[in-house]
């Protein structure tokens, strides 16, 4: 099946590839229990489609799956087609027969309406709306996620500290390959990125905290907090924490799997 060249979102025609011309990003990688990843995916709305595609959590020795938590701030500049916004992501590595190891984005809250619609309708990214604060990029990012109207309070806090890390020199070419569900079908989503102004802190630098009140009221925030708790991310030591002051990317049209 051929990939689309464009799609209309909220009355606007969006042409692929979709550019990100200016953003900053901070994140951390973890090893988490594959059995918990499997259980979280099975409880989600996309589980039947992912099962039919044969997707399974990557299981390293000890039954562990690589995971990432990330905070991205998209800047208010011309050329950022989806606008200026924050997003916080939780993603896992899955094996998909015939496609190797792909990343599955499990949660992707954002703080603006248009990117929420675009992420879901263009690529099947599981975006929902919350309030977020934080810098992203730089050597210290105190990212906070809460319900709409909370100014980031009462949800999940993600502190990413690379101040004692090592600089990553020059420009880094990065690639993203995801498996998501779009219009009831499994799709592969790819992006090519370039990042500069990086720092890396091995074996530490991240602290994930579930704030008081995270389980009360907002169902999306409560679900995110429960996933953090079940995965043990609020107790885990990061494999590495990273930040990039400058991040540019192009997101390609989704490709049907199978």
Say what each PLM segment does.
Residues 28-30, 69-72, 90-92, 108, ...:
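Generic structural hydrophobic/aromatic packing signal, biased to beta-strands
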Residues 2-9, 116-258:
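Interaction-surface and assembly-scaffold signal
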Residues 32, 41-43, 92-93, 107, ...:
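Generic hydrophobic/packing signal
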Residues 48, 110-112, 126-128:
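Generic alpha-helical propensity signal that fires on short helical segments
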Residues 1-85, 221-224, 231, 237, ...:
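N-terminal domain-onset segments
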Residues 71-116:
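Hydrophobic/aromatic-rich structural module bridging two neighboring secondary-structure elements via a short loop
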């Amino acid at each position: 099946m051929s990939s689309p060249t464009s799609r209309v979102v909220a009355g606007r025609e969006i042409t692929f590839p979709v550019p990100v011309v200016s953003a900053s990003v901070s994140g951390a990688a973890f090893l988490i229990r594959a059995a918990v990843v499997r259980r979280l995916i099975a409880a989600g709305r996309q589980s039947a489609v992912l099962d039919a595609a044969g997707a399974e959590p990557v299981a390293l020795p000890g039954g562990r799956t690589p995971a990432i938590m990330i905070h991205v701030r998209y800047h208010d500049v011309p050329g950022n087609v989806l606008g200026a916004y924050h997003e916080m992501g939780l993603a896992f590595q899955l094996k998909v027969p015939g496609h190797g190891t792909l990343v599955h984005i499990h949660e992707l809250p954002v703080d603006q309406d248009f990117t929420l619609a675009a992420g879901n309708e263009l690529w099947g990214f599981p975006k929902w709306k919350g309030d977020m604060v934080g810098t992203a990029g730089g050597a210290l990012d105190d990212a906070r996620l809460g319900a709409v109207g909370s100014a980031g309070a009462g949800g999940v806090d993600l502190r990413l500290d690379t101040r004692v890390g090592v600089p990553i020199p020059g420009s880094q070419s990065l690639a993203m390959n995801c498996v998501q569900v779009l219009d009831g079908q499994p799709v592969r989503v790819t992006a090519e990125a370039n990042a500069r102004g990086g720092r890396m802190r091995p074996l530490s630098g991240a602290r994930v905290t579930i704030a008081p009140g995270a389980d009360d009221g907002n169902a999306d925030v409560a679900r995110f907090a429960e996933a953090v708790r079940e995965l043990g991310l609020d107790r885990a030591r990061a494999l590495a924490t990273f930040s990039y002051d400058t991040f540019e990317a192009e997101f390609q049209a989704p490709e049907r799997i199978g």
